[in-house]
Structure formats: C-alpha cells, structure tokens
Amino acid sequence: MLEEVLIKVLVLNDLYSTNILGTYAVAKHILDLHIDERLKNGDASLVTDIAHIELNGKEKYFYSFATKYCAMHQPKLFPIYDRFVGEMLRYFRKQTHFARFANADLKNYAEYRTIYDAFIQFFALNDFTYKQVDNYLWKLGKEHVQEKGKKEK
C-alpha cells in the first residue's frame, strides 16, 4: 500500500513540479491519515490534513500538492489550486466581482471550493468539469503572470 501512495506522490511531484523533497515521508503521512472514506465524501478538511506535514523537524504546508492529490482520486469533488489559478480568481474578482473573498480564503480549501464553484456559476461553466476549468484558468494564469512580468521589466 505504501508503494502505491509513494508512486502517486512521485508522479504528481514530477508532473506538476510541486518541489516536494521528502516524497517518502509525504507518502507515509498520507497513508497514516487513512484517507479513503474522506476522499469518497469530498471532505475539504482532508486537503489541509494532507498539506500539513513535519519534515526534518520543520512544519511544511504543501497545499497545492494536497489539492492535486485529492483531485487525482476524486476529480469531481476536488478542484486543484495552484498559483496561476489563484492569480486568475483574484483577477476575475477584481474585474467582475463574481465573489467576495479575501486572498487568504484561497488557501482555506473549503472556502476555495466555494469560490471556485461561484466562479463556475457566475460564468455559466456548469457543463465543464473542475479539470477543464482548471486547465483554462491555469493556462490563462500562466499567460497573465508572464505578461505582468514583461510589463515590470
């Protein structure tokens, strides 16, 4: 069982460049949480529980990785968070006022999922999956961040 979790952690770490150095410790941490029921139920607090880990005596918070791990298992229940998606949700909040939220709310997974769902509702994207919306926001966010970087130079 640990080997299966470790493979998933390694794949996600490579695929999404999550920069987790202690992959074995993260896999063991996930296994120790006994997550199956919580994944099945879409338990938002699971993201926080996976994200919080102590590595080499230091407290780490792998939030983006934790959202991706949960989304890999239950893509209909867990939208992915990363900096590009967060950037675009903040951008659309400013441009359209689709939802009221503090930036810090994006790092509270229950709040984040509510914000994400509000974005989907506001823009009538109900026919699209979380994964499809994530792909759109990620690509747009990456371009947006690159453009901002060019303007700052």
Regions found by a protein language model. Give the residues of each.
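An N-terminal alpha-helical hairpin/helix-loop-helix interaction module that forms a charged
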Residues: M1-K58, P75-K153
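Short hydrophobic alpha-helical segments that form membrane-spanning helices or hydrophobic packing faces
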Residues: F65-A71
